[in-house]
Amino acid sequence: MKLVSVALMYLGSLAFLGADTARLDVASEFRKKWNKWALSRGKRELRMSSSYPTGLADVKAGPAQTLIRPQDMKGASRSPEDSSPDAARIRVKRYRQSMNNFQGLRSFGCRFGTCTVQKLAHQIYQFTDKDKDNVAPRSKISPQGYGRRRRRSLPEAGPGRTLVSSKPQAHGAPAPPSGSAPHFL
């Protein structure tokens, strides 16, 4: 029984290490995937480029009537001026511009996750800030609250505080009148 368990342990480790040390040809796998991707992209670009002209030379060389279908024409007039090469060129230009603008809802600016979080936080702040009023609560305005009014209503100088005036004083000069605002350190 002991021999069987040792043999199983030996075979298991051999199989594990053998599979671990077997070299995979990563470069050839990558090359295969790359070639497949490049081939499919080339086919897609070939189909797209043959569906509509890409430049002015293609418009002059190719037939212009294929770009304007009778369904696309507005109005009942079917004059020969509407299907002229100039009209077709304008039509192609508008078509290309609309396709470039429609390629997904492009968002300009930062595309990182942190920027998205900051934008969302800013929007939340804007939405919630409109209901707030700019007046402090009465409990904060009172003499027991915080702010300028409390500092004004405090007693002049307590035993643990020192008064410092905003104006420099000479030695032996009298203290400033009680009407001026003292500064505490």
UniProtKB/Swiss-Prot annotation:
Keywords, in A-Z order: Amidation, Cleavage on pair of basic residues, Disulfide bond, Hormone, Secreted, Signal
Free-text function comment from the UniProt entry: Numerous actions have been reported most related to the physiologic control of fluid and electrolyte homeostasis. In the kidney, ADM is diuretic and natriuretic, and both ADM and PAMP inhibit aldosterone secretion by direct adrenal actions. In pituitary gland, both peptides at physiologically relevant doses inhibit basal ACTH secretion.
Main subcellular location: secreted
Family to which this protein belongs: Belongs to the adrenomedullin family.
Disulfide bonds: 110-115
Keyword ATP-binding: no
GO molecular function, one term: adrenomedullin receptor binding
Protein name as annotated: Pro-adrenomedullin
Range of residues in the leader sequence: 1-21
UniProt-listed GO biological process terms: adenylate cyclase-activating G protein-coupled receptor signaling pathway; adrenomedullin receptor signaling pathway; branching involved in labyrinthine layer morphogenesis; cell population proliferation; developmental growth; G protein-coupled receptor internalization; heart development; inflammatory response
Subcellular location: Secreted
Gene encoding the protein: ADM
Disordered: region residues: 60-87, 133-185
InterPro entries in the record: Adrenomedullin-reg_peptide (IPR051665), Calcitonin/adrenomedullin (IPR021116), Pro-ADM (IPR001710)
Entry-annotated residues carrying Arginine amide: 41
PANTHER family noted in UniProt: ADRENOMEDULLIN, ADM, PRO-ADRENOMEDULLIN
Site (described: Required for CALCRL receptor interaction): 116, 125
Residues making up the propeptide: 45-92, 148-185
Cellular component aspect of the GO annotation: cytoplasm; extracellular region; extracellular space; secretory granule lumen
Tissue specificity comment: Highest levels found in pheochromocytoma and adrenal medulla. Also found in lung, ventricle and kidney tissues.
Keyword Transmembrane: no
Chain positions found as Tyrosine amide: 146
